[in-house]
């Protein structure tokens, strides 16, 4: 898509401001130059058109990088309808650029919960009736859940869903275990070129950026507590350490806790002896009373609960880089404490009660992005080079599932293929190779003798399925 050239009669969209489209297009051009894997897939599959006939319902953060993803899907033959998976994550110039290209999109930064639900519905509906979609691309699982609960008939012709995040994958696995999942899914999140890039290196880049944009604080010498040490927690801990913070980590998984120790982080618990009995008496107030910044990274619920929030140091910064706002008990904060907006997505939450507050009061917490994704609420998320790997995985996963034609199978065949699986390793390696080439790197090829010696082919895949990178 080379220019802003909206069809005169096109109105199948809702964005904040169409005058931002030219700006969004300029930023998209820059992003394309930083996304070699995605652009490589456009070139590689342009003639083949592997997504011709695909009608994709997409729900993922409507950023500049997502604009490149959307236009790659379209370039490979797909039709799409799009919304954002987070009320604060849309970059309005990106949404405008996509609408200007004649692609249905329903997203703007600062949606209410009701508007968010409306946007999801508009993704599904065309001219007031369910669109004849046959593929889903999701981030977090809200779109997938809505289709299963409210529009199950659509799923009869859907070949599958590709899911971007840890949270969404958990929801899919739960649905599968309960017998509720009606279509196969590709777990894009656990592709190596997604989890090690997006979750780890992306958070390493974007977390400190968001905190500094939101607060203008110097982070050096201050104490941080990172809740969780999975890939997101690892990247987040590195992000804060490289700013000079004294970083402590809280974990429930002994293996991840061991990794944190080996990486040089002190493993602590906000609860005395690690046990949360639901009372304030179980809180390690001495620890939390020294914490200047707390970051949740888990994808789990209430990992920063009301009792922890009560015990935190005055004026501490609280934020989340997991998925939903329920990692932090923001419901308790809204019910019991007064909120003062400093600027969009930055609030002073006064712990002196729910009524009027004294602006000079110093017993407050600084909450970023209302407990939602801080890197997209207070900044622009991961850089294009990081999202290149994630979105190249999405494209290959869409091609793979669309080619499997699940909706056309017999009931017996469907029963066999109703799974939640990661992308085949060979495709993961294809993404990685394009990314390495984008850096100007050269990958060494095995000789036939070397390949035979370790039991692989010269072309790969090079590692067994269970290999942990």
Curated annotation (Swiss-Prot):
NAD(+) binds at residues 165-167, 199, 228-233, 251, 300, 321-323, 375. It is found in: Cytoplasm. The keyword Hydrolase applies. The keyword Hydrolase applies. It is an enzyme of class 3 (hydrolase). Its cofactor is NAD(+). Substrate binds at residues 63, 139, 164, 194, 198. GO terms for biological process: L-homocysteine biosynthetic process; one-carbon metabolic process; S-adenosylmethionine cycle. Pathway: Amino-acid biosynthesis; L-homocysteine biosynthesis; L-homocysteine from S-adenosyl-L-homocysteine: step 1/1. Binds 1 NAD(+) per subunit. It holds the Pfam family AdoHcyase_NAD. NCBIfam families: ahcY, PRK05476.2-3. May play a key role in the regulation of the intracellular concentration of adenosylhomocysteine. This is Adenosylhomocysteinase. It comes from Pseudomonas fluorescens (strain SBW25).
């Amino acid at each position: 898509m080379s220019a802003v050239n909206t069809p005169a009669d096109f109105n199948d969209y809702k964005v904040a401001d169409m005058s931002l489209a030219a700006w969004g297009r300029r930023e998209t051009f820059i992003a394309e130059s930083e996304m070699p894997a995605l652009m490589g897939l456009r070139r590689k599959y342009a003639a083949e058109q592997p997504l011709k006939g695909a009608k994709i319902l997409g729900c993922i953060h409507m950023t500049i990088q997502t604009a490149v993803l959307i236009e790659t899907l379209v370039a490979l033959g797909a039709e799409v309808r799009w919304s954002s998976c987070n009320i604060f994550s849309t970059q309005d110039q990106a949404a405008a650029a996509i609408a200007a290209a004649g692609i249905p999109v329903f997203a703007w930064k600062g949606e209410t919960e009701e508007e968010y639900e409306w946007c999801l519905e508009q993704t599904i509906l065309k001219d007031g009736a369910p669109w004849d979609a046959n593929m889903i691309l999701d981030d977090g699982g809200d779109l997938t859940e809505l289709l299963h609960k409210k529009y199950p008939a659509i799923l009869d012709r859907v070949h599958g869903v590709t899911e971007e995040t840890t949270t969404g994958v958990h929801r899919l696995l739960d649905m599968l275990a309960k017998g509720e999942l009606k279509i196969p899914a590709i777990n894009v999140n656990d592709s190596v070129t997604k989890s090690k890039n997006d979750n780890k290196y992306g958070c390493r880049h974007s977390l400190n950026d968001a905190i500094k944009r939101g607060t203008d604080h110097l982070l050096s010498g201050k104490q941080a507590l990172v809740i969780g040490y999975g890939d997101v927690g690892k990247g987040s801990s590195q992000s804060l350490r490289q700013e000079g913070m004294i970083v402590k980590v809280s974990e429930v998984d002994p293996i991840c806790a061991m990794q944190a120790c080996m990486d040089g982080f002190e493993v602590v618990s906000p609860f005395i002896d690690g046990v949360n009995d639901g009372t304030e008496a179980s809180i390690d107030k001495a620890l939390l009373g020294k914490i200047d910044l707390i970051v949740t990274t888990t994808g789990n619920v209430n990992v920063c609960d009301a009792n922890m929030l009560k015990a935190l140091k005055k004026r501490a910064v609280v934020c989340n880089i997991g998925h939903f706002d329920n990692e932090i008990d923001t419901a308790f904060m809204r019910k019991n404490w007064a909120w003062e907006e400093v600027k969009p997505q930055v609030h002073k939450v006064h712990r002196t009660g729910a009524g009027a507050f004294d602006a000079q009061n110093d017993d407050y917490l600084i909450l970023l992005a209302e407990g939602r994704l801080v890197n997209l609420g207070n900044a622009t998320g991961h850089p294009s080079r990081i999202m290149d790997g994630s979105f190249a995985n999405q494209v290959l996963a869409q091609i793979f599932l669309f080619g499997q034609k699940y909706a056309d199978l017999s009931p017996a065949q469907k029963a066999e293929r109703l799974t939640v699986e990661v992308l085949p390793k060979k495709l993961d390696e294809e993404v990685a190779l394009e990314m390495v080439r984008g850096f100007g790197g050269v990958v060494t090829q095995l000789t036939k003798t070397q390949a035979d010696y370790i039991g692989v082919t010269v072309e790969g895949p090079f590692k067994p399925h269970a290999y942990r990178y």
